[in-house]
Amino acid sequence: MGKIIGIDLGTTNSCVSIMEGNTPKVIENAEGARTTPSIIAYMEDGEILVGAPAKRQAVTNPRNTLYAVKRLIGRKFEEKEVQKDIGLMPYTISKADNGDAWVEVRDKKMAPPQISAEVLRKMKKTAEDYLGEEVTEAVITVPAYFNDSQRQATKDAGRIAGLDVKRIINEPTAAALAFGLDKNEKGDRKIAVYDLGGGTFDISIIEIADVDGEKQFEVLSTNGDTFLGGEDFDQRIIDYIIGEFKKESGVDLSKDVLALQRLKDAAEKAKIELSSTQQTEINLPYITADASGPKHLNLKITRAKLEALVEDLIARTIEPCRTAIKDAGVKVSDIHDVILVGGMTRMPKVQEKVKEFFGKEARKDVNPDEAVAVGAAIQGQVLGGDRKDVLLLDVTPLSLGIETLGGVMTKMIGKNTTIPTKFSQTFSTADDNQPAVTIKVYQGEREMASGNKMLGEFNLEGIPPAPRGTPQIEVSFDIDANGILHVGAKDKATGKENKITIKASSGLSEAEIERMVKDAEANAEEDKKLRELVDSRNQGEALVHSTRKALGEYGDKLEAGEKDKIEAAIKDLEDVLKGSDKAAIDAKVEALATASQKLGEKVYADMQAKGGAEAGAEQAAAGAHAGAQAGHGAPQDDNVVDAEFKEVNDKK
């Protein structure tokens, strides 16, 4: 059985980890970085760039470069959070037929899980390159405060990427696993995981206990805000720059998509710099132009100014902390350790506020960018049966219930209930001779169902005629370890029942997921063909170069006819190298290799005559051997070709 990898699918950055024995290993991607920007670019020629290459070209291709898509996953178009993002994002967010928020790229509508799948596919490939084997199973993390629709959509993204998602695990819980397993402290400890990432905020109170040599991680409570994170901090800086520039030059940059993309990059850099310096300068020449000519942007921002701009955002994280402490039934003084997760927790003001609330310094021995992926890998090891000394007890973040008479939300499973869990309750009909009941399932904390998120509905039909209140209908709720809900309803008199796995009131249908999986496979086939074409092109160019070099040195030793034949073969190969026909390139490579055999023999004979066989090896390669190898894909050239291929990609 292959390894189960751990993936932190982040709003801004993603990370992949595996376990080597009992040691976690965060894997570097093809660009050599341990985290990958969650950015996807759709190019004009159909190529899809993911990560750093996508980020590098964002300024020139803002409408087709997607970032922060996790903020849309599992959400309806009409939700106020989505509406807020529509005005801020350079790309188009549109309404799908099922009411979900989708994205439009190059005249094509795409679902957020389909886009996130591109990032997951890169994470999968990163792990496969390192392990040297195919990876098919993963544990993927989500914010603890993600609702059922968002969890289901994340699982769908995994499937589209070709992964069997063994478990969806909450990010703070994963970070606690990463923290707790390498600590040798004995006895029970309560920890707070404060997770402020690129797009979401979570706080979890977790108890780590030693039970018969086994470490038990029990989540006592969780709270958060799935629309608060580093992207919002960046936006405050962008708005400030736009305002200052307008005051100074009279030009409004908010409608200039290219300028906005440059501002976003500059804002993110400034925010990061201000975590370690007191002042930074934003310098963007030629940001725009008007009738008077080009305009340049130059602005100094101090740490104090940034803190003033985002003060209320940081304050918004404290109320969920208060609620989580109360729900866990503990006091702030009971917390042994505070762990900071997510890139935004590097901001000194955030650390100060956390210290102020919890009354203690946060631990500095946890990597905020990598802890979540490491925890996911540990959970993967547990699920794979390779680790028996860990037990993880997570919770459902929000209450679940059904709508009953008068539009009331009758809660079946309360928030912070340990999962997996089951619960059933008996209900009856509201009208005489009612033949069917509609079960509407909601998630949230409001008293009235309409104030909560509707997850789905289904009917139980064929109820025998009876006065209202007589039929006995048992409704059962079952939450699995992924936090995904299964609901059933049964008429006790007839034994008739109906069950559903809640597939959000919208979400992707099975057929849509299958289509996206097929699309992804087709893309992979296209990528493979493109890669093979580039390989052939590189080999062809290398052969032209080496043959020309040998011809310059030894051409005078050939008969005129032989030399003409080689030069004609070089020209033929150069002509086909301009095109995209792999078969034609391969054929001309073979033809040049054959034509230059005589040249190779001359080179070799000359070297032997001089007794310099070693020195001649390189030149001999220009003849028959180099030609033949290039024609048949020389294995020793693979690494060189890889590097050249990436370089080509990055410049697109």
From Swiss-Prot:
GO terms for molecular function: ATP binding; ATP-dependent protein folding chaperone; unfolded protein binding. Residues 611-634 have a biased composition (Low complexity). Keywords: ATP-binding, Chaperone, Nucleotide-binding, Phosphoprotein, Stress response. Residues 610-652 are annotated as: Disordered. Induction: By stress conditions e.g. heat shock. It holds the Pfam family HSP70. The modification Phosphothreonine is found at residue 200. Signal peptide: none annotated. InterPro entries: ATPase_NBD, Chaperone_DnaK, Heat_shock_70_CS, HSP70_C_sf, HSP70_peptide-bd_sf, Hsp_70_fam. Residues 643-652 have a biased composition (Basic and acidic residues). It comes from the Bacteria. Belongs to the heat shock protein 70 family. Acts as a chaperone. This is Chaperone protein DnaK. It comes from Ralstonia nicotianae (strain ATCC BAA-1114 / GMI1000).
